Amino acid sequence: MPKKNEAPASFETALGELEQIVNRLESGDLPLEEALSEFERGVQLARQGQSQLQKAEQRVQILLADSEDSPTTPFTPDAE
């Protein structure tokens, strides 16, 4: 597992690590301190992933804005 301050190599790597953390937390077998540490790392990974997704969204909007043939509309995620 990467150190707490170490950024994952990619979005996919972070997502995979986050899934493993969720599985370990859901098992209920971790001692409290270890569960808190895992939760903290999970929050960090989720924030990094959200940031990466926002940057990717901005890049897509910029690329689409460069195309004069098709108008663009801001992305709005579906409410779940």
Swiss-Prot record:
Q: Which GO terms describe its biological process?
A: DNA catabolic process
Q: Which GO terms describe its molecular function?
A: exodeoxyribonuclease VII activity
What Pfam family is a match, any one?
Answer: Exonuc_VII_S
Which Enzyme Commission number(s) are on file for it? 3.1.11.6
Q: What class of enzyme is it?
A: hydrolase
Listed under catalytic activity are: Exonucleolytic cleavage in either 5'- to 3'- or 3'- to 5'-direction to yield nucleoside 5'-phosphates
Location within or outside the cell: Cytoplasm
Keyword hit for Nuclease = yes
One GO CC term on file: cytosol
Q: Which domain of life is it from?
A: Bacteria
The UniProt keyword set, sorted, is: Cytoplasm, Exonuclease, Hydrolase, Nuclease
- Role according to the record: Bidirectionally degrades single-stranded DNA into large acid-insoluble oligonucleotides, which are then degraded further into small acid-soluble oligonucleotides.
Query: What is the similarity comment for this entry?
Result: Belongs to the XseB family.
Quaternary structure (record): Heterooligomer composed of large and small subunits.
What the entry lists under NCBIfam families is as follows: PRK00977.1-1, PRK00977.1-4, xseB
The protein here is known as Exodeoxyribonuclease 7 small subunit
